UniProtKB/Swiss-Prot annotation:
Gene: ctpL
Annotated keywords: Cell inner membrane, Cell membrane, Chemotaxis, Membrane, Methylation, Transducer, Transmembrane, Transmembrane helix
Chief localization: membrane
GO terms of biological process kind: chemotaxis; detection of phosphate ion; positive chemotaxis; signal transduction
Listed transmembrane segments: 6-26, 306-326
Function: Chemotactic-signal transducers respond to changes in the concentration of attractants and repellents in the environment, transduce a signal from the outside to the inside of the cell, and facilitate sensory adaptation through the variation of the level of methylation. Chemoreceptor for inorganic phosphate, which is required for taxis at low concentrations of phosphate. Is also responsible for the positive chemotaxis toward 4-chloroaniline (4CA) and catechol. Does not recognize inorganic phosphate directly, but via a complex between the periplasmic protein PstS and inorganic phosphate.
Protein name: Methyl-accepting chemotaxis protein CtpL
Source species of the chain: Pseudomonas aeruginosa (strain ATCC 15692 / DSM 22644 / CIP 104116 / JCM 14847 / LMG 12228 / 1C / PRS 101 / PAO1)
Subcellular location: Cell inner membrane
One Pfam family matching this protein: MCPsignal
GO cellular component, one term: plasma membrane
Residue span(s) of domain Methyl-accepting transducer: 385-621
Ranges in the topological domain labelled Periplasmic: 27-305
Cytoplasmic side: 1-5, 327-657
Amino acid sequence: MRLKQLTNLNTLLLLTVCLALGITLWWSQRAMERPFQLLDQYLELSQRFDEQVARNIRQYLGSGDAVRQQAALQALESLAEALPELPPDLARTLAPSLAELREFSAGDLLAAGKLAGDPQGLLLQAERDLTGNLEQWSAYLDAAAGQPQAGAYRTPLLLASLHLTRLSLARAKLVESANPALAGDVERELANLREQAGRIEALPLLGVLDEQRSASDDFAAMMGLAGDAEAGAGNAEDRGVALRRELASLLQRYPDELRRTRDLIERRQQLSADTGARLDAVRQALATLEPQVRGERQRLQGQVRLIQGGMIALILLIALAIDSLQRRLARVLGQLVPALSAWADGDFSRPISLRTRTEDLRNLEDSLNRLRSFLAELVGAIHRRAEQVAGSSQTLAEVSSGLHAGVERQAGDTGQIRDALGDMEAAIQQVAGDASQTADASRSAGQAVEHGQRVIGESLGGLRELVDEVQGNAQSIERLAEESATIGSVLTVIRSIAEQTNLLALNAAIEAARAGDQGRGFAVVAEEVRSLAQRTAGATEEIQQLIGRLQQAARQSVEAMRSQVEHAERTAEQAGAAEGALDEVVAAIHTIGVMAERIAEGSTQQSQAVGEIRSHSERIHALGGENLRLIGHSREQGEQLRQLGGDLRTTVQAFRL
């Protein structure tokens, strides 16, 4: 048997399991949907019956509306059409009760609806007629109010009205309750009413004639038969006769109307009971469907569980079959592990032997044995080539070592030349830089000296202006001192005036004291004047002291300014001498700058020449280093090749052929 066939068999088994599982799941889902569909159909039938059939029938019985009856019939027909959707057993259970209800709705229910009107309408009309007759009797009594016999009518008429009211109440109770036992109350009140009618009939007439002409009299008058009409008027009868006949007729008709009303009520009750029984029969039939629906659901669930159990058993069997095939294949392939492990260790001396009847595995055995023979021959050839590579790599390593030593010496010499040229170039660049810095410094010094000349010139002018200003300030301060002396003379005059005022105030106070009470006011004024004179004298003394200090400060300022003028004049003379010396310094610095620029230009040219020589030596040294690197790499590769040759020889020796 081939491996492909085993693989196809496993695949077929797995596909079979998947297909069977899918079919089972699909069938289970469909089977589980069926009970829910049946339950939905059952609930829908129940709801439709209650809302569309039972409700319309009840409304038809209450109102007699034919539209409700037609709606109920249409709903029953719709339910009958929906029965084939149910299982046959359920449909057979529900069909008879629906058919009976549909036949009843089309026949007896229609008659019951016709009786849906008010069954006591005839009795109400008869009672209204009796009420009207009694009212006419009252009008009859009013017309004969002057006669003594009229009073005998009032008591029976009043009692007749009372019994008529009781009759209406008893009739209403009978109709509303539909209780036959209440019919005796109606008959008793009717008998009382007849009794009063008999009493009224036994009373004598009151002689009130009927003055209204009939329609035949009017017609006779129109045709010219006036004589006949007058003859008829002469034969007019008492109004009480007609009222007696009408009352007797109404009382005789009322029992017949009562009997017909009772029959109508009984028929309505019977039809309502029949309708309720048929509706209950349909509801009972629908109720019996629920256990059947649930039983159908349990049956389908049992089938689903049975089929699912079978599928699980089938899956287990297929899994066991696949496991058995895989174990057999694993045992056969396990025989390859020792031989392949020996090959991995380099031992090709043992061939592979598989004991199997599978054609593909036998082909695999032959292929692996051919591979063992090929690898053995290949390892032998590699062993021979490894010996040759080891000898060649040894020779190449010796040549590379000699070449590497020569190139190293050459690289060392070129490196020394490069370093010497670098030092020389650095020295020349330093000289050129120093000369350039000297030229720059000389230029900067010249500019600084020129700036110093300008500053000294400006300072010299400023000093001269300062001397002039200081001299002007000294003169101003001297004038201030002179003015202060003038203020002192003025203060002397003020002081003398204050002393005289004080003496005058003292004399005035003495004279006021001599005058007594009359000179008291003048004494006060004199005291104030004396106080003012004393304050003036004090203020004058303070001003005199202040002016003295001011004059002292002015004299000191004049002396200081004179000293500053002398110092400024000496400084101006020194600045003039410094300006002349700076002119000589500027000329010398200019000469130094020119010479430094020439030195810098020569150094720059020498530095450029040395730089070119150094760049050439750098390239020579770089080429030597690159050659040294390549030769070193070649030597490393030769050494690696020698090592690889040795490793290859050692590795090939590990194989056993």
